[in-house]
């Protein structure tokens, strides 16, 4: 009986801890997205347009590997590893136009977060 109770408590504790870690990583990703947004404001004030990933994507971008994050860091943070050295587990990219943008973050579990230029972070699916 005691062993069963300890087993149940262990299972509950593991699930609770996993949920806590997942929430902490998402919060970290959201904070980094806000930093990217600030860097975009500086980019716009210097060049008159916002930076976008890849081939000047306007409707979406792929954030499922580190290449997009590395390109973003090179363009907006002078290569400083703001995204790739974080413990968030998310990669990021940016899509939009010269006058508007959306920051997209994605992790290996398929959680997709999006932050439009003048909005709040939106979990694009139920995997977050």
Q: Over which residues does each language-model region extend?
A:
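N-terminal single-pass transmembrane signal-anchor helix
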Residues: 1-17, 21
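Periplasmic/extracellular, small/polar-rich flexible segments of pilin-like filament-forming proteins
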Residues: 42-128
């Amino acid at each position: 009986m005691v062993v069963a109770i300890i087993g149940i408590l262990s299972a509950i504790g593991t699930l609770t801890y996993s949920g806590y870690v997942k929430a902490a990583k998402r919060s970290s990703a959201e904070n980094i997205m806000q930093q990217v947004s600030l860097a975009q404001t500086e980019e716009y004030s210097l060049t008159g347009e916002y930076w976008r990933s890849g081939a000047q994507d306007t409707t979406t971008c792929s954030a499922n590997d580190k290449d997009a994050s590395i390109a973003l860091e090179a363009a907006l943070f002078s290569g400083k590893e703001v995204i790739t050295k974080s413990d968030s587990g998310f990669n990021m990219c940016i899509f939009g136009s010269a006058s508007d943008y959306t920051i997209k973050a994605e992790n290996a579990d398929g959680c997709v977060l999006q932050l439009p230029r003048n909005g709040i972070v939106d979990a694009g699916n139920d995997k977050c």
